[in-house]
Regions:
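N-terminal export signals
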Residues: 1-2, 7-27
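An N-terminally biased module of ancient metal coordination in phosphate/nucleic-acid-related enzymes
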Residues: 8-9, 24-251
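H/E-rich (His + Asp/Glu) clusters that bind or coordinate divalent metals
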Residues: 28-34, 394-563
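Histidine-centered catalytic micro-motifs
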Residues: 47-57, 364-367, 397-400
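Active-site neighborhood of phospho(di)ester-bond hydrolases with catalytic His/Asp-centered motifs
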Residues: 48-50, 231, 270-272, 307, ...
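Acidic (Asp/Glu)-rich catalytic clusters
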Residues: 216-223, 253-265, 292-302, 357, ...
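Active-site gating/metal-coordination segments in enzymes
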Residues: 224-374, 436
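Distinct, well-ordered alpha-helical segments
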Residues: 246, 280-297, 318-321, 373-389, ...
Length: 563
């Protein structure tokens, strides 16, 4: 739909109460409108990215994440963690600051949207926060070096981290060009440079991250991202001893509601559910109920699903059977050391699953044995734990069990495929995504053959063909850690599936690429007209004055559902 000048002028902010206090609903900003050819094509095939992130450093415990999680893989990052402890994260926009900026942007554009006007604002905000982040990192490094000189640079990691920070260019355009010249790899100095690039993302406005993603992934790709599903994260209890982030989860939800409106429905979100925090709330140790937050987000704020993160320290089911003392870890708060903690985790997860089944709400779970603070917790991503969840639950197995899928490494993916059932059986609504499959960046030919073999093997009498359940996902902005090559993730997958489309033996019941990039996600998210999920979104758009998004028009044109 092409928006008129009247719709542009009527896009001024309308007042609405949120937990941020006095915040507003943001009408779609039409200078970067839903039919902008840079990010949109009404004639391109439906493309949905089911797995993305646009958070910033006020939304997650970035220092704890780098120190407790990423440094387990790359020990040199412990030195980066020390610097991040010195950073004043008030530089990263809070939820209230982001809403204020969105109001300013809308005010600037309410009298009319001249050519490139939104782009000028977007670029100015991006450069402002890039410079602020660069300054914050350099100042923090100076303090650490002064305190530990010359010890800090005497180690390989300290020297690599210091060089990466001191080398940051003086403007964002120079920085982006500098990134494109580098080819990061997940080893040594390159891993440090990539981690610093990820940290620089954490100083940005969330709306800047959104439009950077949309423009980067649309460049050089025949497909355009019609719908991006972003996932909020809640690591307050698993990583931060119960201390909330600078922008609390409730405020993050409010901000992402506004961004859904800002983008004209091109971006929707999953609310985070941490069962550890829910147990803490039930016991009186936390004032915030994840259950209440996710239900409000789904029913009235345009959110479309719920995100859980097992490698932070819980299985999807069966926690009561863990060995005694399993949660007695030094980084976990004392209330989690109690002997009945596993049973309580199972209880709150069972309540969540029942509500999701009753309301037609999908779940996404991180299923790769990675991104946890210890190996014991990462092992909780094993597929066997999912046999005990309710059979009617709708689930996306994020990363399809492993981010390293290769022809000789298919066992975890096949184990997750075996969980998927046909209509009427357990797992009838189980899916998986291809987010952060690093071989797509490093060895796309190798990944093509791995996926071909996987599709050929994953066809059975009791399980549906994998071709009908695997979905496209990127895991941007986490993928930024892989370096500048991450910008080619979508285009590389386009080429991979262009090759696979020629093989009629893979079980797609139609064009495999159409399934992978759009149809399977539309089925998983229940986006077709008449579903409870679609009804919630249609009501959300009507209440906020958002025209029918392009993704909805494309979904409406899909042939009847083929399971």
């Amino acid at each position: 739909m092409v928006l008129t000048r009247r719709q542009i002028i009527n896009g001024a902010l309308s007042i609405g109460a949120t937990s941020l206090g006095g915040c507003v609903f943001v009408r779609p900003i039409t200078a970067f409108c839903p039919d902008d050819p840079r990010i949109s094509n009404p004639n391109s095939p439906l493309t949905i990215d089911v797995h993305g992130h646009v958070f910033n450093g006020s939304d997650i415990q970035i220092e704890r994440y780098i120190t407790l999680v990423r440094a387990r893989q790359t020990p040199a990052l412990k030195d980066l963690g020390e610097i991040l402890q010195e950073v004043g994260w008030e530089v990263a926009p809070s939820g209230a600051q982001e809403i204020s900026v969105l109001r300013q942007v809308n005010q600037r554009l309410s009298a009319g949207c001249g050519p490139g006007e939104f782009e000028r604002l977007h670029i100015a905000h991006r450069n402002e926060k890039y410079l602020a982040g660069r300054s914050a990192l350099n100042e923090a490094l100076t303090r650490v070096e002064s305190r530990r000189r010359p010890a800090f640079r005497s180690t390989y990691g300290g020297n690599a981290v210091a060089n990466a920070i001191r080398s940051l260019p003086t403007s964002y355009p120079e920085y982006h060009h500098w990134q494109l010249r580098r080819a990061y790899r997940a080893v040594g100095t390159d891993a440090v440079n990539a981690a610093v690039a990820f940290v620089m993302r954490q100083f940005q406005y969330r709306y800047v991250n959104v439009f950077d993603f949309l423009t980067e992934y649309s460049s050089g790709s025949a497909r355009k991202i019609d719908l991006l599903i972003c996932h909020c994260l809640d690591f307050d209890w698993p990583l931060a001893l119960g201390k909330p982030t600078m922008t609390p989860i409730a405020d993050q939800i409010d901000v992402m509601e506004q961004i859904s409106i800002l983008t004209g429905g091109r971006v929707h979100c999953y609310a985070p559910f941490d069962p550890m925090k829910q147990v803490a709330y039930d016991l009186g140790y936390s004032t915030e109920s994840p259950e209440s937050l996710v239900q409000k987000a789904i029913l009235s704020q345009g959110f479309v699903g719920i995100k859980i993160y097992p490698p932070m320290g819980f299985a999807p089911a069966g926690n009561a059977h863990m060995k005694p003392g399993f949660w007695n870890r030094k980084w976990l708060p004392a209330p989690m050391h109690r002997p009945d903690f596993g049973r309580r985790l199972d209880d709150v997860l069972a309540r969540l699953y029942s509500w999701c089944v009753a309301n037609g709400v999908p779940i996404m779970a991180h299923t790769s044995p990675s991104e946890g603070p210890c190996s014991d917790f990462e092992n909780l991503t094993a597929s066997d734990y999912w046999w005990a969840v309710p059979g009617g639950l709708t689930v996306n197995f994020g990363h399809f069990g492993d981010t390293e899928i290769a022809p000789d490494n298919l066992s975890r993916a096949l184990a997750y495929w075996k969980l998927m059932g046909r209509s009427g059986s357990h797992g009838a609504n189980f899916y998986a995504d291809a987010a952060y499959l690093t071989e797509a960046l490093k060895e796309p030919v190798k990944l093509t053959e791995a996926l071909r073999r996987l599709f050929q093997m994953a066809q059975g009498k009791t399980s549906p063909a994998l071709a009908q359940r695997l979905m496209y996902g990127s895991d941007w902005e986490m993928l930024v850690i892989e370096g500048s090559a991450s910008e080619s993730y979508l285009s590389n997958f386009e080429q991979i599936f262009s090759n696979l489309d020629r093989d009629a033996s893979l079980g797609a019941q139609g064009k495999l690429s159409a399934r992978f990039f759009g149809i399977n996600a539309a089925n998983y998210l229940s986006l077709r007209a008449g579903s409870a999920a679609r009804a919630r979104l249609d009501a959300f758009y009507a209440a906020r004055g958002v025209p029918t998004p392009q993704w909805a028009q494309k979904v409406n044109a899909l042939p009847p559902l083929v399971a």
